[in-house]
Amino acid sequence: MVVLIAFNKPFGVLSQFTGDGSPNRALAEFQFPKNVYPIGRLDADSEGLLLLSDEPAWNERLLHPRHAHEREYWAQVERIPTPESLQQLGLGISIQGRKTLPCRAWLLEPQPEVSNVAASRQSAANCLSEETAALCRDAATLTIPPRVPPIRFRKSVPDCWLGLELIEGKNRQVRRMTAAIGHPTLRLLRVRIGGLKLDDLAVGKWKILSAEERKLVAGE
């Protein structure tokens, strides 16, 4: 049976079926159909949309940069990047002697809602200069659930959510990119692959994609 599955991977779960001695959880506990495997990966400390399939062709189709297949990430970072920093991300960052491919990077505005954030916490939107705000794109209506365990905030350091749209996926690439411009990533979610969005798929849940949803993934 040929299937393509969308899975909302929780924090602390490996993108593999066995733990190999790791303290993290593995995919085996989520009772996927037999003979499926993850297409690409998300680090254990990253969350969001992960695809699985028993059809090998999806791997090359979605992962090879020559197909320019988009993946969208939301990254919660320390401090508020300047327009120059966002432009630097978009043009490419040198990481370990290799420059990343050009991408899209923007400040999400309004900022995504996290259900357990205290109302008294200062909104990142209030920290934006007019010049920086001009680079903002609308965030989707996705409400982000709290992470378990929660991230550690530094009260003296503001944070905000960035959107990044990449066509490549090197090891810990988004985290290394934001760190290179002085904005360490606190939390990272993949919210879209091709035209398929994470939307309301609950954390830790998966679904077999319909024919129409498969077309969204493929960008058809």
Which role fits each region the language model picked out?
Residues 1-121, 130-134, 141-220:
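RNA pseudouridine synthases
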